[in-house]
């Protein structure tokens, strides 16, 4: 054996980084394995996503309205949620489970749990930023940041700099009466869980964000407690903090096999075989995002997680663009200001591991930004990105012990909420590894809910 740790964490994205940080902060001897040459690699779901911290997102992806809307979108290549037709038993299983999760009684039972996870994680984000990280610009929950600031994501944690996040809300704008009416109905349900939501008229939208230029905007919804940050900077800062607390970070370590059974772990995982050697551990955490099912199949687990391709485009941020994230509601296009960059992002595309860039998708992002806030739909692009979000059928993550391996903990399947739920996932995974009762009841997040 080349290495032995209390815990080995597989995956150097935001979830793996947060789990490693939480374990190292507790004094565990933890090793993080990342298959690429650096943590938070460009292929990861967090590298260039929209950087949203959204405690307001309490409605899971699978909800009653999603089924009807999804059926209209599924085979439309330009829709926000597209399923590429293909012969796949895994996809068929995922769609069947998604259908069941959209049942009203199921969705209603999931929303309070997602709200609790989001609220606790938002508080942990504040705590992490207060101790050696970047400031929460805007003065904390419920305060607006009126200025452009000095930019998000300023390096690692050297010199007390760290990342920055802005807690100044998220503004949705709608261009149709039907879109606004649906948003108002959703706002009522969200308020019932204690989330602050404001419905705005077209005039109020322009008062809050004068940069919104489209005459077609009929109104909007503001979630004032949401925020944004550079997701890659945050992830790397968590890894740097874990290293400072003694964690070992091993890159270029692709896991290709497991050694199981025997020893102190019983019917568990004794070691992981990787391209950088063999790593033994008392416990293993799988936090590999969309790659998790591939790893777990080696152990007989078939998690229904689909790699949902998302896109983003970085352009130079024009003067006068909004200081808070904006979502063009009907198009589901998000515009996030990140310092001198404006990131345009959207879409869920279930195309298996086909990660090709589709020009139609990219053009749709630019058209929406041009129409609503006047961002030129042609011109220089700083970066074009796509990456796989780990999408579960019910929109909830998988957190808890493996149903088949006593010393393996799963922390994956966060869909589009990895950045938001990273800190709470780190805490919960660390509690499970320590044999403690989790501080939040995560029974509903167990992998065996999918019959694995």
Regions found by a protein language model. Give the residues of each.
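N-terminal Rossmann-like FAD-binding beta1-loop-alpha1 element of flavoenzymes
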Residues: 5-32
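C-terminal lid/capping helical subdomain adjacent to the catalytic/cofactor pocket in oxidative enzymes
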Residues: 5, 199, 396-398, 402-452
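Glycine-rich FAD pyrophosphate-binding loop
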Residues: 25-47
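Active-site substrate-recognition segment that forms the wall
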Residues: 49-52, 57, 61-102, 257-260, ...
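A conserved short coil-to-beta-strand element within the FAD-binding core of flavoproteins
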Residues: 200-204, 208-209, 251-270
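Rossmann-like flavin
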Residues: 92-240
């Amino acid at each position: 054996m080349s290495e032995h740790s209390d815990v080995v964490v597989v995956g150097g994205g935001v979830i793996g980084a947060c789990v490693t940080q939480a374990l190292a902060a507790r004094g565990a001897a933890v090793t993080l394995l990342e298959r690429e040459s650096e943590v938070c690699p460009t292929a990861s779901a967090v590298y260039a996503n929209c950087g949203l911290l959204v405690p307001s997102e309490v409605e899971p992806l699978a909800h009653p309205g999603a089924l009807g809307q999804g059926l209209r979108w599924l085979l439309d290549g330009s829709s926000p949620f597209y399923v590429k037709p293909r012969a796949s038993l895994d996809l068929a299983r995922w769609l069947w489970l998604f259908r069941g999760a959209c049942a009203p009684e199921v969705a209603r039972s999931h929303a309070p749990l997602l709200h609790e996870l989001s609220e606790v994680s938002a508080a942990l984000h504040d705590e992490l930023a207060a101790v050696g990280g970047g400031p929460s610009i805007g003065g904390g929950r419920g305060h607006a940041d009126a200025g452009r600031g000095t930019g998000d994501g300023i390096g690692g944690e050297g010199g007390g700099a760290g990342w920055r996040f802005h807690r100044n809300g998220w503004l949705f704008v709608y261009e149709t009466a039907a879109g606004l009416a649906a948003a108002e109905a959703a706002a009522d349900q969200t308020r019932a869980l204690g989330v602050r939501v404001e419905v705005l008229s077209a005039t109020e939208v322009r008062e809050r964000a004068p940069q919104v230029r489209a005459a077609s905007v009929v109104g909007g919804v503001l979630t004032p407690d949401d925020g944004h940050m550079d997701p890659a900077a945050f992830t790397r800062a968590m890894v740097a903090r874990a290293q400072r607390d003694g964690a070992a970070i091993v890159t270029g370590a692709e896991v290709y096999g497991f050694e199981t059974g025997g020893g102190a772990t019983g019917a568990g995982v004794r070691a992981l075989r990787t391209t950088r050697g063999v790593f033994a551990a008392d416990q293993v955490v799988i936090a590999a995002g969309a790659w998790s099912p591939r790893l777990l199949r080696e152990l007989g687990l078939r998690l229904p997680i689909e790699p949902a391709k998302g896109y983003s485009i970085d352009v130079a941020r024009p003067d006068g663009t909004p200081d808070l994230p904006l979502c063009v509601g009907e198009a589901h296009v998000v515009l996030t200001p990140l310092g001198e960059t404006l990131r345009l992002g959207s879409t869920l595309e279930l195309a298996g591991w086909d990660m090709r860039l589709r020009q139609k998708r990219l053009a749709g992002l630019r058209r929406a930004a041009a129409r609503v806030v006047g961002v030129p739909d042609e011109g220089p692009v700083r970066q074009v990105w796509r990456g796989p979000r780990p999408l579960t059928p019910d929109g909830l993550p998988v957190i808890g012990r493996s149903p088949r391996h006593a010393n393996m903990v799963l922390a994956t399947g966060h869909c589009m909420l990895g950045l938001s739920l990273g800190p709470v996932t780190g805490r919960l995974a660390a509690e499970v590894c320590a044999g403690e009762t989790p501080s939040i009841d995560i029974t509903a997040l167990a992998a065996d809910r999918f019959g694995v």
